Amino acid sequence: MTAAVTQDNTSRTGAAAGRVVRVIGPVVDVEFPRGAIPELFNALHADITLTSVAKTLTLEVAQHLGDNIVRTISMQPTDGLVRGATVTDTGKPISVPVGDVVKGHVFNALGDCLDTPGLGRDGEQWGIHRKPPSFDQLEGKTELLETGIKVIDLLTPYVKGGKIGLFGGAGVGKTVLIQEMITRIAREFSGTSVFAGVGERTREGTDLHLEMEEMGVLQDTALVFGQMDEPPGTRMRVALSALTMAEYFRDVQHQDVLLFIDNIFRFTQAGSEVSTLLGRMPSAVGYQPTLADEMGELQERITSTRGRSITSLQAIYVPADDYTDPAPATTFAHLDATTELSRPISQKGIYPAVDPLTSTSRILEASIVGDRHFAVANEVKRILQKYKELQDIIAILGMDELSEEDKVLVGRARRLEKFLGQNFIVAEKFTGQPGSVVPLEQTIDDFDRVCKGEFDHYPEQAFNSCGGLDDVEKAAKKIAGK
């Protein structure tokens, strides 16, 4: 086990002091005495006064330029920082509080508590740059994580202790789905949750904090935010800060941990900004040449070790709905399950707008989920795939040109498509409909019956946003009554 970082600020180089020689936005060059050059990733502190307010800037060493000069990235705005200002090497990386003290509180990327200033600074702290567990400590996981969301449990089952990606463009429901997952899992989950808000909207962070407080799950959750209005250095490091807190719960307290990250794309985006500021030549589509390395360093630490696990749910924005973009494409390789949110499905009013044909899970195998689950999931996909193939014919020639068999299949596929949607708990205040939680066995039974045609005579609209088939029958009677 790596030794914990304490509050001792004594530098290995004797708290060496340097001076600022250049400031360009968040990039600060600092000159140190010969033989006292700080190591890469060390945190440096600079005291400044702006409009009569004194504050301490944190800089992270990014490059050694030679001639005793280091190039750093500031974690806060550099307004008020001037050439010649004194900079002190702390002798350690950015460190965050760890342990039970972080539960129920909101922190920034530097480990400062935002709702209770000073909290955790006199206790144990860990540096945010850490090595992943060694190969012999890792443990493979194949246990299904039941969510109560039909489309996920049936077609893209999540792995306990695995990494799950929620992919989607702007406005298709990534944040709503991740909030729903927090609500559902945290209520039944006995361990600790850590939420990392990476470069997303401050408003969403506030909403999440209030909702978790209202649901009664905040006392077992640590929230770490580096939002849109913060410098790229902060947005790049906030995921590591949250992950460090999660690693403590896994490695020291031997807990199963839930780690939510919203949004991984903003982590990549911040890395791209920092790379440009450091003068690196951009790679494909303007991203940093170190994209795969940076993603790997983060993802390799999010893993399960013997006897304990980190289950990670990561929202991943897909720019311009282009899945070949290097940012989402680099993330795919690290995930156990991918849930792709589709704009055409969301435009039909089906939520969650999960694309059942492109979403995947490595545990959707008969040897893991069972023969019946596997067979029903494949039959649902077969019907939906056939419907997709017929859509061009329907659009050009109309339904009348289809064979009787295909007409039946299209009607069944439309019912299945609508039945894959359901009401969410977090959306109750907007829809006025209670959220539904459907057990996995019921989901398998219900979809098996729909696939066999038992409900072909029910109107399609009866399947909208329903939980189980009981809800469908009630909706059908209501429609018939009109």
Swiss-Prot record:
Main function: Produces ATP from ADP in the presence of a proton gradient across the membrane. The catalytic sites are hosted primarily by the beta subunits.
Database matches in PANTHER family: ATP SYNTHASE, ATP SYNTHASE SUBUNIT BETA, MITOCHONDRIAL
E.C. no: 7.1.2.2
Membrane topology, as annotated: Peripheral membrane protein
GO molecular function, one term: ATP hydrolysis activity
Enzyme type, top EC level: translocase
Chain residues that bind ATP: 168-175
Cellular compartments annotated: Cell membrane
InterPro entries in UniProt: AAA+_ATPase, ATP-synt_VA_C, ATP_synth_F1_bsu, ATPase_a/bsu_AS, ATPase_alpha/beta_chains, ATPase_F1/V1/A1_a/bsu_N, ATPase_F1/V1/A1_a/bsu_N_sf, ATPase_F1/V1/A1_a/bsu_nucl-bd
Reactions listed under catalytic activity: ATP + H2O + 4 H(+)(in) = ADP + phosphate + 5 H(+)(out)
Protein name, as recorded: ATP synthase subunit beta
Domain of life: Bacteria
Main location: membrane
Pfam families given in the database record: ATP-synt_ab (PF00006), ATP-synt_ab_N (PF02874), ATP-synt_VA_C (PF22919)
Subunit structure: F-type ATPases have 2 components, CF(1) - the catalytic core - and CF(0) - the membrane proton channel. CF(1) has five subunits: alpha(3), beta(3), gamma(1), delta(1), epsilon(1). CF(0) has three main subunits: a(1), b(2) and c(9-12). The alpha and beta chains form an alternating ring which encloses part of the gamma chain. CF(1) is attached to CF(0) by a central stalk formed by the gamma and epsilon chains, while a peripheral stalk is formed by the delta and b chains.
Annotated keywords: ATP synthesis, ATP-binding, Cell membrane, CF(1), Hydrogen ion transport, Ion transport, Membrane, Nucleotide-binding, Translocase, Transport
Classification via Gene3D superfamilies: 2.40.10.170, Bovine Mitochondrial F1-atpase, Atp Synthase Beta Chain, Chain D, domain 3, P-loop containing nucleotide triphosphate hydrolases
One annotated Gene Ontology cellular component of this protein: plasma membrane
Family in the record: Belongs to the ATPase alpha/beta chains family.
